[in-house]
Amino acid sequence: MGKQVEIFTDGSCLGNPGPGGYGVLLRYQQHEKTLSEGFYHTTNNRMELMAAIIGLETLTRPCKIVLTTDSQYVRQGITQWIHNWKKRGWRKADKSPVSNVDLWQRLDQAISRHNIDWQWVKGHAGHDENERCDELARAAANSPTETDTGYLENRD
């Protein structure tokens, strides 16, 4: 496997649903890159997913990654729940459709070429990189520029 990369992610939503944003910090050796984007109308879970997706999609070749998130929804979803969702045709155990299926499918595609160690940290607990991502996500949520078409199309 290629380079060893650290990815830190966070999502934010003002209202849930409401304006939202994601923040990503990528680190390779001594190099760091930050990414963020704001959306007019979305949810916190969609922004948490987008942060992980964008972080992974930014990489141009297969990597060994430690991805750190403060979202149990993202971490458990991608490491545990997704396997049964796929077996059931993207349905939960109660036969209802998986929420945010567009992003789960995109994340599933994004992880396929990487070796990823998914780590969880408690949000707002002084974890430096998580705090930086939170600041990026909140700033993006406060200045949205994009439409989350997946949220608009999949709303009940």
Swiss-Prot record:
Co-factor binding details: Binds 1 Mg(2+) ion per subunit. May bind a second metal ion at a regulatory site, or after substrate binding.
Biological-process GO terms, alphabetical: DNA replication, removal of RNA primer
Annotated Mg(2+) 1 binding sites: D10, E48, D70
Enzyme class: hydrolase
Enzyme Commission designation: 3.1.26.4
Main location: cytoplasm
GO molecular-function terms, A-Z: magnesium ion binding; nucleic acid binding; RNA-DNA hybrid ribonuclease activity
SUPFAM superfamilies listed in its UniProt record: Ribonuclease H-like
Cofactor(s) listed: Mg(2+)
InterPro entries in UniProt: RNase_H (IPR050092), RNaseH-like_sf (IPR012337), RNaseH_domain (IPR002156), RNaseH_sf (IPR036397), RNaseHI (IPR022892)
Keywords attached to this entry: Cytoplasm, Endonuclease, Hydrolase, Magnesium, Metal-binding, Nuclease
Subcellular location: Cytoplasm
Subunit structure: Monomer.
UniProt family annotation: Belongs to the RNase H family.
Protein name: Ribonuclease H
Organism: Photorhabdus laumondii subsp. laumondii (strain DSM 15139 / CIP 105565 / TT01)
